Curated annotation (Swiss-Prot):
Protein name: Glycerol-3-phosphate acyltransferase
Broad class of where this protein is predominantly found: membrane
Domain of life of the source: Bacteria
Cell location: Cell membrane
Pathway(s) of this molecule: Lipid metabolism; phospholipid metabolism
Quaternary assembly: Probably interacts with PlsX.
Enzyme nomenclature, EC number: 2.3.1.275
Catalytic reaction(s) noted: an acyl phosphate + sn-glycerol 3-phosphate = a 1-acyl-sn-glycero-3-phosphate + phosphate
Family the entry assigns: Belongs to the PlsY family.
Classification of source organism: Bacteria, Bacillati, Bacillota, Bacilli, Bacillales
């Protein structure tokens, strides 16, 4: 069982490493999104550089990376406690952030982390998504909405009584905020781009 779990965790990392934005940009738009906008491989920069259609596809793909990776123990009928689903999910987040296929320079882990939560705690995902969308509607800042959504997920998880989930969501929230530190500076300086499509 231990070997199988290790293998699934490695597979989850590989799944997380799929650079959706990079590949879609290069294949369909002949653009390397690392050379435009924020230079980030995530969904937000895909929206900014490639447009709403491509950005939406990248977002869905990045969410699915987290969801599929989290459910790997279920798909392979591995007889482990469901908390181990969070382990494979965590490896997908690591893969997305430090992708094997993109020089270990990845995204900010928001969408893939959301996919992990979707697979493990769907109601928590919905609640955090609502907070994200409301914040996005009011502020027009994707970065700010992502951070507030992550913090909301942490606060809500505290009432769920699942301490392993709480620890993971706390790590996700801290990591998301850390990855957005440049965005925080730009928001303070009034230099952070706002979305125009919502």
């Amino acid at each position: 069982m231990t070997i199988n779990l290790i293998l699934l965790s490695l597979l989850a990392y590989v799944i997380g490493s799929i650079p959706s934005g990079l590949w879609i940009g290069k294949i369909f738009y002949k653009k390397d999104i690392r050379e435009f906008g924020s230079g980030n491989l995530g969904a937000t920069n895909s929206f900014r550089v490639l447009g709403i259609k491509a950005g939406s596809i990248v977002t869905v793909m990045d969410i699915l990376k987290g969801t599929v990776a989290t459910l790997l123990p279920f798909f392979f009928q591995l007889n482990v406690d469901h908390h181990f689903w969070l382990l494979t999910g965590a490896f997908a987040i690591i893969g997305h952030s430090f992708p094997l296929f993109a020089g270990f320079r990845g995204g900010k882990a928001v969408a893939t982390s959301a996919g992990v939560i979707l697979a493990y705690a769907p109601l928590l995902f919905v609640a955090a998504l609502v907070v994200f969308l409301v914040t996005l509607k009011l502020s027009k800042y994707v970065s700010l909405s992502s951070m507030i959504g992550a913090l909301a997920a942490l606060i809500i998880s505290l009432f769920m009584g699942d301490w392993i989930l709480i620890v993971l969501v706390a790590c996700i929230a801290l990591f998301v905020i850390w990855r957005h530190r440049a965005n925080i500076t730009r928001i303070r300086n009034g230099e952070e781009p706002k979305i125009k499509w919502m």
